[in-house]
Structure formats: structure tokens, C-alpha cells
């Protein structure tokens, strides 16, 4: 996704 708060930040 590319979100900083996202644990699956790819």
C-alpha cells in the first residue's frame, strides 16, 4: 500500500 502506519507496507 505504502502507508507508514500499515504493517504490510510494501
From Swiss-Prot:
Protein name: Unknown protein 2
